Amino acid sequence: MDKKDVIEFFDRHAPDWDAEMIRNDAVISTILDNANVRAGARVLDVACGTGVLVPDYLARGVASVTGIDISPEMIRIAAGKFPSDKVSFICGDVEEAALDGDYDCIVVYNAFPHFPQPQRLINRLSGLLAPGGTLTVAHGMSRRAIDGHHSG
């Protein structure tokens, strides 16, 4: 899939995304523990979709969350759900967007397979980390489950 196809796919599915979200709170909690998401942290949520992890970040007392997603519809929905000064959303390609950097935690959750050049993404995100910051790439589903989830 090229980026245009990815945008079209996620724009089409955005209205039902939250209802169809397969969520395992224990797995998410462990992922965020390992990502060192903690009070006072600046978090970059890559391919944030409708902001499904934003409540988890806020519950941990983070200083700020920046969500970025290539899908305008996903960002529109996310922005409508979280009217907080601690949360901001950017519609754009994380590999090209102008980002402030110095993030304590960068999380790529349920999205890494959608990036056609993984090393390019890792290099880009690594450059946005604050000293001692963490980059976490995690997925809550198996490859088979992912394929089934995105087959529509």
What positions do the PLM features span?
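Short catalytic micro-motifs in class I SAM-dependent methyltransferases
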Residues: 110-111
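Short glycine-centered segments of the SAM/dcSAM-binding site in methyltransferase folds
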Residues: 42, 133-134
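Conserved class I S-adenosyl-L-methionine
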Residues: 1-38, 52, 136-152
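A short glycine-rich, Lys/Arg-flanked "PGG" loop and its adjoining helix->strand segment in the class I
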Residues: 120-131
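A conserved beta-strand element that flanks and buttresses the S-adenosyl-L-methionine
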Residues: 107
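Class I SAM-dependent methyltransferase SAM/SAH-binding core
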Residues: 44, 50-96
